[in-house]
Curated annotation (Swiss-Prot):
Protein name: Ubiquinone biosynthesis O-methyltransferase
S-S bridge residues: none
Annotated EC: 2.1.1.222, 2.1.1.64
Gene symbol of the encoding locus: ubiG
Protein residues bound to S-adenosyl-L-methionine: 39, 58, 79, 123
Amino acid sequence: MTPVENVDLSEVKKFEDLAHRWWDAESEFKPLHEINPLRLDFIDERAALPGKRVLDVGCGGGILSESMARRGAHVVGIDMGEAPLSVARLHGLESGVSVDYRRTTIEELAEAEAESFDVVTCMEMLEHVPDPASVIAACARVAKPGADLFFSTINRNPKSFLFAIVGAEYVLKMLPRGTHEWKKFIKPSELAAWLRSADLDLCEMRGMTYNPLLKEYKLGDDVDVNYLMHAVKPLKDA
């Protein structure tokens, strides 16, 4: 599969159509705004962001990219949606936060800038591409030896169908209907296998759960629905 082929144009259009609402914390992107502090701290506590060159894969409108830049990282954000990237650039100008946003695939960038990033993040993106294993392999290629890599996605099981699709999209209406396809969700065992195939070492896995009564997210051991993984690219032998 070529870099351009590993793009689901219907998925790109889905987020293009909503791009103008990306930074509205009460919009369809409210969940992203609410989980951002958790995932930002998860990354920063393990990778020490200040001064690091960071790649945010599938950056969308720049919520995470901009947050990492505010922590002192030098961030490159990539996405295939031009509208979200335009929103991200405009918001960066308004907020005075510098992020290098580019319209490209991770596979293309890996060819041009191999082993050039200290940290790679790929959050809430893998379940939206035809070949997530290709994305992970390219993330590994673009990372420096010793780099930290972070991935987040949604588990594939009956509970995730109930919570992430029925609950989030139909009952609580936290997300637009059709945001996710259950068959594209990824089991932790599958993600871990792809990490191993890319010669990455899995360091940690954490679940992210939502309490609808308290309306808050927290990290824990429950990986039945949303989860994050931290991996490291091994140093080269001397």
